[in-house]
């Protein structure tokens, strides 16, 4: 994976100014609380728009303020896992997953649900509600 990030973003009194390049499969952003790690990731994923700069992933320009390129999140092929898991607490794990499966027949949705329960290793938790789940289980649900 190749990633180039050179962005700036002003949000209230906070000024984000991030510049790095990585040529590795795994990348970790480390820093103190409130230093801009999540904001940087949101900009890479397209959830938040930088004020200026460039983001290039594997040779694809995702954002470039000078030439007005700003790929929408769904075209970036970047996943973002929110810190707050945004599960509906009154719905089972199965129903939470089904919210993300919008197309297909009833049988196709059931197959996709089963595959996702297995994929995220929460197969035995499908009928449970989110509040009693551990944070890692909520994240995978």
Question: Positions of the model-derived regions?
Answer:
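ABC ATPase NBD coupling module
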Residues: 62-79, 103-106, 110
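Conserved ABC ATPase signature
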Residues: 129-139
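Conserved coupling/switch loops of ABC nucleotide-binding domains, chiefly the family-specific signature
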Residues: 51-58
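Helix-to-loop junction immediately C-terminal to a conserved catalytic motif
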Residues: 45
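Conserved ABC ATPase "signature" region
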Residues: 60-65, 107-126
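Short coil-to-helix segment of the ABC ATPase nucleotide-binding domain corresponding to the Q-loop/switch region
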Residues: 90-100
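Walker A (P-loop) phosphate-binding loop of ABC-type ATPase nucleotide-binding domains
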Residues: 32-36
């Amino acid at each position: 994976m190749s990633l180039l990030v050179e962005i700036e973003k002003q949000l209230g009194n906070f000024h984000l100014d991030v510049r790095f390049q990585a040529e590795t499969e795994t990348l970790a952003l480390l820093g103190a609380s409130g230093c801009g790690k999540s904001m940087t990731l949101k900009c890479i994923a397209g959830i938040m728009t930088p004020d200026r700069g460039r983001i290039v992933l594997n040779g694809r320009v995702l954002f470039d303020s000078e030439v007005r390129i700003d790929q929408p999140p769904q075209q970036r092929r970047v996943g973002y896992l929110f810190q707050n898991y945004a599960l509906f607490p009154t719905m089972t794990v199965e129903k939470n997953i089904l919210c993300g499966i919008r197309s297909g027949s009833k049988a196709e949705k059931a197959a996709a649900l089963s595959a996702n329960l297995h994929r995220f290793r929460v197969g035995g938790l499908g009928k449970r509600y989110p509040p009693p789940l551990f944070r890692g289980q909520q994240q995978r649900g």
